[in-house]
């Protein structure tokens, strides 16, 4: 990626969106400039780094400070138009020179600690991912030369509070944010980074020994599992709109059972073979309902009413009024069939189940008895 391509906006639905840079780039730049300040013994207010994707970033330095053989500097995180929990916060680096010839990297205040296996970092270590570790160490080495050593501490005073708005606690990263970024650049509306974070939670569940997983679109699904199924939510992973991707990831990781749990407004799309459920990809909710109601012998009047609905909830009211609530069991079976069709070339296919529930947390339908599914999940 060239500097020009970094400055060029990302177009999404007709809007020009600005790129940003990761916490990893911030930490790298802060460490580099702190190392340079120790060596030169004067404050520096701007620093440049080359990101793993080849982009050169020229960043403003905040809170520079030198005290003997130690210096501190901060870079303010800018996510561009892809605003996340870390946007606008300061990422600090403290660099202390020594004669060891080695560079040691630690996480201080506001940087999370790894407490679970599955994310590729040792238990008890700072949540500074592999790529940022490499770029930080390389930038400091470039600054101090081959003979000197340095102790580098990355810290973020707002980190513990900001981390509460992230997935970190679910990933077993406690006490602060993560220093992340494989490219160093934040691309607005990037599905890949979002998908990767969801997949990472799957990897952690599998590394903990779980072989059965419940995929839900969001928090409502997790609450239903806890309150209505009586199943430990340790087995629950959010799939968001990325149904097909998360199913394939679960298969790749060797889960033997996948249970899809959600409201018909999301899961009904799977019955039509739609495995990315965001409305900008596809809708077909009413068309799918109408088709399956017709297969069950519903009268034309009901089909017309459902076809004219704008929301799944409105359609569900008509379905209930006409006594066709059994469609939800039918749809759940169809969802499982579609999943197995998608996985037809997989050597070892998992057991697939689907459970549909209403917004008031009532079970609408499932491919087989929910009690039976719940019992298996508790094994």
UniProtKB/Swiss-Prot annotation:
The keyword Ribonucleoprotein does not apply. It comes from the Bacteria. The gene is cbiD. This is Cobalt-precorrin-5B C(1)-methyltransferase. Pfam families: CbiD (PF01888). Keywords: Cobalamin biosynthesis, Methyltransferase, S-adenosyl-L-methionine, Transferase. One of its GO terms (molecular function) is cobalt-precorrin-5B C1-methyltransferase activity. HAMAP family: CbiD. It catalyses: Co-precorrin-5B + S-adenosyl-L-methionine = Co-precorrin-6A + S-adenosyl-L-homocysteine. Coiled coil: none annotated. Signal peptide: none annotated. InterPro entries: CbiD (IPR002748), CbiD_sf (IPR036074). One of its GO terms (biological process) is anaerobic cobalamin biosynthetic process. Pathway: Cofactor biosynthesis; adenosylcobalamin biosynthesis; cob(II)yrinate a,c-diamide from sirohydrochlorin (anaerobic route): step 6/10. Its EC number is 2.1.1.195.
């Amino acid at each position: 990626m060239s500097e020009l391509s970094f400055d060029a906006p990302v177009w999404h639905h007709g809007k020009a969106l600005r790129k940003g840079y990761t916490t990893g780039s911030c930490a790298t730049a802060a460490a580099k400039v702190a190392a340079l300040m120790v060596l030169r013994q004067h404050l520096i207010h701007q620093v440049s780094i080359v990101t793993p994707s080849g982009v050169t970033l020229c960043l403003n330095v905040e809170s520079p400070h030198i005290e003997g053989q130690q210096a501190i500097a901060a870079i303010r995180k800018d996510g561009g138009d892809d605003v996340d929990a870390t946007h606008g916060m300061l990422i600090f680096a403290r660099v202390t020179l020594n004669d060891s010839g080695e560079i040691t990297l630690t996480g201080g205040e506001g940087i999370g600690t790894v407490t679970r296996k599955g994310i590729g970092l040792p238990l008890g270590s700072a949540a500074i991912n592999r790529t940022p570790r490499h770029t930080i160490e390389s930038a400091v080495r470039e600054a101090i030369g081959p003979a000197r050593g340095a102790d580098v501490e990355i810290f973020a005073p707002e980190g513990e509070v900001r981390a509460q708005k992230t997935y970190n606690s679910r990933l077993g990263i406690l006490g602060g944010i993560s220093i992340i970024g494989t490219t160093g650049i934040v691309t607005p509306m990037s599905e890949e980074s979002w998908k990767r974070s969801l997949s990472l939670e799957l990897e952690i569940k599998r590394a903990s020994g779980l072989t059965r997983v419940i995929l839900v679109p969001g928090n409502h699904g997790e609450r239903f599992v806890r309150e209505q199924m009586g199943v430990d939510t340790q087995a629950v992973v959010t799939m968001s709109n990325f149904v097909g991707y998360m199913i394939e990831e679960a298969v790749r990781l060797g889960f033997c059972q996948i249970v899809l749990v959600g409201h018909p407004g999301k899961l009904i799309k799977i019955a039509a073979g739609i495995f990315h459920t965001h409305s900008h990809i596809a809708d077909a909710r009413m068309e799918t309902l109408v088709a399956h109601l017709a297969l069950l012998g519903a009268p034309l009047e009901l089909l017309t009413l459902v076809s004219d609905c704008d929301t799944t909830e409105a359609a569900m009211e008509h379905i209930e009024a006409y006594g066709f609530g059994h469609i939800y069991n039918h749809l759940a079976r169809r969802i499982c069939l579609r999943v197995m069709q998608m996985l037809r070339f997989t050597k070892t296919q998992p057991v697939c189940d689907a459970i549909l529930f209403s917004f008031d947390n009532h079970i609408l339908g499932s491919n087989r008895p929910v009690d039976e599914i719940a019992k298996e999940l508790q094994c």
